[in-house]
From Swiss-Prot:
One of its GO terms (molecular function) is asparaginyl-tRNA synthase (glutamine-hydrolyzing) activity. It comes from Anaeromyxobacter dehalogenans (strain 2CP-1 / ATCC BAA-258). Its EC number is 6.3.5.-. It comes from the Bacteria. The keyword ATP-binding applies. Allows the formation of correctly charged Asn-tRNA(Asn) or Gln-tRNA(Gln) through the transamidation of misacylated Asp-tRNA(Asn) or Glu-tRNA(Gln) in organisms which lack either or both of asparaginyl-tRNA or glutaminyl-tRNA synthetases. The reaction takes place in the presence of glutamine and ATP through an activated phospho-Asp-tRNA(Asn) or phospho-Glu-tRNA(Gln). HAMAP family: GatC (MF_00122). Residues 74-84 have a biased composition (Low complexity). This is Aspartyl/glutamyl-tRNA(Asn/Gln) amidotransferase subunit C. The lineage of its organism: Bacteria, Pseudomonadati, Myxococcota, Myxococcia, Myxococcales.
Length: 97
């Protein structure tokens, strides 16, 4: 089932995205393909599969590494290209009243 351009526009509004007409067409195709894949997954018989709370069994968790401080951008470097900033913080439009 293909998503209509109107459905893509509604999703874009909800996600607060501005899409060009070309992007709307591209996303309509991509989202439709994703939904088709999910529909195929829904058809699989998983009655013999034991439910899991994690993708890996408890004994198979990957090894953890120690945290390490690595070189990073300064606050000034990180905000240098921001359209708006206040001191060393990004300034964004208020979306919640």
């Amino acid at each position: 089932m293909a998503l209509s351009l109107e459905e893509v526009r509604r999703i874009a509004v909800l996600a607060r995205l501005r899409l060009s007409e070309e992007e709307e067409r591209t996303f309509a195709g991509q989202l439709s393909a994703i939904l088709d894949h999910v529909r195929q997954l829904e058809e699989l018989d998983v009655t013999a599969v034991e439910p899991m709370t994690h993708a890996l069994a408890a004994g198979e968790l990957p090894a953890r590494r120690e945290d390490a401080v690595l070189p990073s951008l300064t606050p000034e470097e990180a905000t240098a290209a921001a359209p708006a900033r206040e001191g060393t913080a990004f300034k964004v439009p208020r979306i919640i009243e």
